[in-house]
Structures are given as structure tokens and as C-alpha cells.
């Protein structure tokens, strides 16, 4: 559900902030964004007891800390942790291209107005949310999450390259871009399941913290790379690079899946 809610937030934010900017100016739009963030912070504080868990859960965590977990930092030596980090990093690079540069690139390549390209981005994120919802049911039944990711990412990469070639009309491109979002979204739950399988139970929180830092790193670096392509007037390269990052992320997911299957075979044979 965290993935679905995040995708919905990304889908709604352009419409909300662009509308406020048009009606009242960019300063008011920033104020609205700050007020929303502040409201969420207040909600988290008021409902903090839900996040802290039950007394039994807190007692169990205190017991583990008291006795010292063998996975305090040793999880950093696990190859799968860094493969998962690489997956998040590369997929975040692709996401940064979609978020920050794909609408502008579509505007240039297909001669579309800003309103339509912004709508295309919102449709991408809404489809991504729908894909995540459906992907949750698929991941619950899948024995190999990395293969679900492969199907989604390969299809999304092919669509991204097709968009870069400008072989289709503007309306068809928007439909394809929406389908691309659905394909990426349907892989989300399988991604989380893959990481959970590769994570030591005693260090799950720390592993997810390290792995998710790859998301922030990718979102920070991506605009620099895609911005260079735009500065060099290599606009089709935006979609080609998005496809390249998705396929590179797929390779790391495949390696994680292979490691998980190997470990499961070892555990079965013991």
C-alpha cells in the first residue's frame, strides 16, 4: 500500500500544484506543499502509538538490543544487500527521468502542449498505482519475484524506446506511456518481496534503510544525467536512457533472485 499511495501522490501533485500556481502564484503553491507536509507530520505525531507497536513488540526489540544482534553491521557484507541497493539506485534513475524530464521531452518530440504532457505523467502514475495493486496479488502467488520484475521492466523499456523513435502519434504515445507506468508499477510488490526474501530477519529494518538510500541517491543524480541530454539537444536520448536504466536494474534483480534461489536450495538440503 505504501507504493500505491506514493504513486497516487505523484499523480495528483502536478494537477494540484499547477492549479494553485495558475490561480495564485508559485509562492502559494510552495506554501500549499509545505502545509500538506506539516499536516502529515502532525498526523504521524498524533498517531505515533501505532508506529511504535504494542508493548510486547517493544519488549521484544529491547531484548534483542540488550543481547546484541549478530547482524548489527554484518549485513553490510552481504552481496545481495548491495545488489538490492543497486536495483533501487538504477530504477530511481529511470524514475527521475520520467518525473522531471519525460513531460518536457514529449512536448518537444510530439509538439504537444504542457497540459497534455502533464496529463500523460499523471496517467503514468495512476497506472503505476493500479499496477502495484494488481502486482500485490501476483507477487503473493509468484515463486520467482525477479521474473515478474523482468516481464514488467522489459515491456516498459521497449515502450520507452518506441516513444523515443516518434513512430506513433501523440495520442498513441500517451496511451503507451500510461501502459509503461502500469508495467513498472506491477513490478513494485515483487521488488519488495524479493528484498524481504534476501534480508536477514534480525536486520530487516537496517537493510531496508540502506537499500532505500539507493532510491534517494538515484533521484538526486538522475536530473544531472538527463539534464545533460536536454542541454545537448539529445531529446530522444531521455527515453533511451530511461530504458537503459530499467534494463540495468533488471540485471541486478535477476542476480538477487538467483542468490535467493541458491540460498533456498542450501536451506532445503540441510
What are these regions, as identified by a protein language model?
Residues 52-83:
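Juxtamembrane intracellular "pre-TM" segments in multi-pass secondary transporters
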Residues 22-34, 228-245:
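A membrane-interface helix-boundary motif in multi-pass transporters
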Residues 186-199:
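Intracellular juxtamembrane helix-capping segments at the cytosolic ends
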Residues 141-153:
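Cytoplasmic membrane-interface "Motif A"-like loop-to-helix N-cap segments
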Residues 132-144, 230:
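Helix-to-loop junctions at the C-terminal end of transmembrane segments
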Residues 155-168:
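C-terminal ends and interior cores of transmembrane alpha-helices
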Residues 80-125, 129-132:
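Extracytoplasmic gate region of multi-pass secondary transporters
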Residues 2-52:
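Helix-loop-helix hairpin linking two adjacent transmembrane segments in secondary transporters
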Amino acid at each position: 500500500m505504501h507504493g500505491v499511495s506514493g504513486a497516487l501522490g505523484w499523480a495528483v501533485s502536478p494537477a494540484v500544484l499547477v492549479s494553485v500556481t495558475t490561480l495564485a502564484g508559485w509562492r502559494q503553491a510552495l506554501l500549499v506543499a509545505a502545509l500538506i507536509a506539516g499536516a502529515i507530520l502532525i498526523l504521524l505525531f498524533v498517531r505515533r502509538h501505532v508506529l511504535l507497536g504494542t508493548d510486547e513488540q517493544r519488549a521484544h526489540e529491547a531484548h534483542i538490543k540488550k543481547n546484541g544482534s549478530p547482524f548489527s553491521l554484518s549485513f553490510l557484507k552481504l552481496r545481495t544487500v548491495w545488489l538490492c541497493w543497486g536495483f533501487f539506485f538504477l530504477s530511481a534513475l529511470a524514475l527521475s527521468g520520467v518525473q522531471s524530464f519525460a513531460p518536457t521531452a514529449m512536448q518537444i518530440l510530439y509538439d504537444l502542449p504542457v497540459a497534455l504532457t502533464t496529463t500523460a505523467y499523471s496517467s503514468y502514475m495512476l497506472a503505476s498505482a493500479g499496477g502495484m495493486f494488481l502486482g500485490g496479488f501476483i507477487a503473493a502467488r509468484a515463486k520467482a519475484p525477479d521474473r515478474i520484475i523482468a516481464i514488467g521492466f522489459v515491456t516498459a523499456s521497449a515502450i520507452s524506446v518506441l516513444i523515443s523513435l516518434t513512430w506513433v502519434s501523440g495520442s498513441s504515445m500517451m496511451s503507451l506511456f500510461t501502459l509503461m507506468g502500469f508495467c513498472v508499477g506491477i513490478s513494485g510488490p515483487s521488488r519488495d518481496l524479493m528484498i524481504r526474501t534476501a534480508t536477514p530477519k534480525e536486520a530487516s529494518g537496517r537493510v531496508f534503510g540502506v537499500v532505500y538510500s539507493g532510491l534517494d541517491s538515484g533521484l538526486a543524480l538522475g536530473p544531472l544525467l538527463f539534464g545533460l541530454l536536454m542541454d545537448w539537444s539529445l531529446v530522444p536520448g531521455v527515453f533511451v536512457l530511461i530504458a537503459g536504466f530499467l534494463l540495468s536494474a533488471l540485471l541486478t534483480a535477476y542476480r538477487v533472485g538467483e542468490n535467493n534461489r541458491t540460498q533456498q536450495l542450501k536451506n532445503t538440503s540441510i
